[in-house]
Structures are given as C-alpha cells and as structure tokens.
Amino acid sequence: MPEGHTLHRLARLHQRRYAGAAVAVSSPQGRFAAAASAVDGQVLRRASAWGKHLFHHYVGGSTVHVHLGLYGTFTEWARPPNEAMPAPVGQVRMRMVGAEYGTDLRGPTVCELLDDAQVADVVSRLGPDPLRRDADPAWPWARITKSRRPIGALLMDQTIIAGVGNVYRNELLFRHGIDPYRAGRAIGEAEFAAAWIDLVDLMKIGLRRGKIIVVRPEHDHGAPSYGPGRPRTYVYRRAGDPCRVCGTTIRTAELEGRNVFWCPTCQT
C-alpha cells in the first residue's frame, strides 16, 4: 500500500498540472460516473493529502476523495496535441484531463464525492500527518503513552499517526532500537520525540526523492535490497537475513494482520 509520502507527491503533481483551471472528469469504468459528472468542467481549486488520503478540491465546494488501498494507482500521461484522447486501458475508475496532461485512476479502495462537512469528518478520524506543517506530535504521544498495544501496531493505526505504512513502521523502530512488541506505555517520552523527528525527516526525504530511503550511509552496502530498484532496508522484508548492523538473523511475525520485521539484538 502506498505510504503517505506517495500521496503528497501525487497531490503536488496534480496541483501543479491541473489546479486553477477547468478539468474534464469522467468514469470510463462507470462506477464513478454520477459523481464525475458533478465536477466535470469545474475548476480544480487545489489538491491536498492527509496521510494516505488524496483530495481534489473543486471551486463550488465539491471534493473528490481517493484512498488507493493496496491496489490503487494513478497513471499520468501527456495530452496528445490536436489528437483524440488515448483509449482507457483496464478498469479506469476516474479520468481527469487538463489542458496538457491527463491522469487515470484504477483500483482504488475509495473514490467518492464529498462536501466540506464530509471531508472534515474524514480528516477528523485521522491522526496528525508528519508531512503537514500543522502536525502536532503531542496528539499521538498522548495516545501511545497510555496504551498497552504494541508500538508496532500503534504506528500503523491511522487514527494515531496518518501516513505511516509497513516500511516506515519497521524501519523507524529499527533505527531507534525499539522492539515492535514493546507496549506503547513502555516507550519513553524522549524516545518518542526522537522517533517523531526522525519520521518527519525520513518522510520528507521520501517526498522529495520518491523513494523510501532509510538506511544510513555507513550501512548502505552489502546485501542488495529486497526488490529491484528499491533502496536497501534494515529489516523490512529481510527475514532470515543477517542484520546490517550486528549480524543477527532478522525475524518476522504477524502483528495485527501485518508482517512485522525486527532484529532481536538491536531492538529491545
């Protein structure tokens, strides 16, 4: 599932390419047809992201809300000059076309039209987003320090911190030597403060570079990444491999429905 930095990159791209002008919105698949017709030809005021949620805000008060889920993707394309639009490929839930570019949305978990009150309701259920300037770490700390749940589960809870996915969760805990099964209330305030600052920095790098880069330069060598074109990780998808720092075998288990990875020596 795309993590928060990906949605912020999409919001910035759509802001740059489409905001401030009328756009054509359609639903080749048909499932979003009625909502698409409501904003077709309207001016896109701005695009924004909160955690893993993307919002297209239109002049007039309507907002398209998208959550990509596990399988959703946007495909961006340049509009052919003086030519017919390219035929949709696959099940395109929403197509948005501006003066120079178009984008096709496929496979989202959510693609819906909301009014301002409904947008506020969605956001009210989310924790602070580390990539937003208004993010207040006091909110997640207040929840975490009272909880018996494992910190590895709390970091993935979007009502506590919005935008953290499985890669950032596992890698952040390794970087700070925290066992993912340690209870939230056993996390020290200084530990959390340092981890929050690091999380903000890491996600900003992801936003800027378009990749999740978490391995420090002094450890960025040796065994290759878990996938082609992916930067190295410390623990994510490295179960059975030696730790890049101490050599201990990386472990994995299921934690609240998602795989967690950790080094039993480096993380306590």
Predicted regions, residues:
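Structured catalytic/nucleic-acid-binding cores of DNA maintenance enzymes
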Residues: 1-268
